Amino acid sequence: MLGAVGPGALWGFEREIMNLVPMVVEQTSRGERAYDIYSRLLKERIIFITGTVEDNMASLIVAQLVFLEAENPEKDISLYINSPGGVVTAGLSIYDTMQYIKPKVSTLCLGQAASMGALLLAGGEPGMRYALPNSRIMVHQPSGGFRGQATDIEIHAREILEIKRRLNEIYVKHTGKSLEEIESSMERDNFMVAEKAKDFGIVDKVIDKRGGEQI
């Protein structure tokens, strides 16, 4: 949660971080060209999901996915995830785009993939979902709060239960587990080491060295 940090402070912090992003200089036939490191990696079809999943970040991820599809619809895309989760609807916009576009999307967890981060990790192409050995994965049911009239509270309660049902169905689809197993596993915060996430069906392989995998 962001707590009492206002959007102005957050964007100021992000600007400071961007000032620290390394630049990569390449020689081309037209001379030198400088890229920030993330733009250079985007040329290699690598996208990073880092930090809280929210609308601004999700729109950038979706735009990158669609751009890479337009550039080459037959070439795989790699999604590197280090996220504590965030807003469900923002995460689902990324997930739906991953399923919608033509390129296969491989996923790799480095650091952590919690909440919506875990769902995006699980939503990668079957056989192409990876985790580094010391990464942590956490799944749970959605949470939220609402204040208002009793009828409005009831409406929002039905909505969060519908979201819970939809998320559970997504996990059933990508893990191969039954709905009952998923519901039981999501009842409380469920932390997993990489190997346990593999057994659960969120990832296909735990890797500690780069091999023949396209990631």
Curated annotation (Swiss-Prot):
Keywords: Cytoplasm, Hydrolase, Protease, Serine protease. It is found in: Cytoplasm. The keyword Protease applies. It comes from the Bacteria. Its EC number is 3.4.21.92. Signal peptide: none annotated. GO terms for cellular component: cytoplasm; endopeptidase Clp complex. This is ATP-dependent Clp protease proteolytic subunit. NCBIfam families: clpP, PRK00277.1, PRK12553.1. It catalyses: Hydrolysis of proteins to small peptides in the presence of ATP and magnesium. alpha-casein is the usual test substrate. In the absence of ATP, only oligopeptides shorter than five residues are hydrolyzed (such as succinyl-Leu-Tyr-|-NHMec, and Leu-Tyr-Leu-|-Tyr-Trp, in which cleavage of the -Tyr-|-Leu- and -Tyr-|-Trp bonds also occurs). Fourteen ClpP subunits assemble into 2 heptameric rings which stack back to back to give a disk-like structure with a central cavity, resembling the structure of eukaryotic proteasomes. PANTHER family: ATP-DEPENDENT CLP PROTEASE PROTEOLYTIC SUBUNIT (PTHR10381:SF70). Cleaves peptides in various proteins in a process that requires ATP hydrolysis. Has a chymotrypsin-like activity. Plays a major role in the degradation of misfolded proteins. One of its GO terms (molecular function) is serine-type endopeptidase activity.
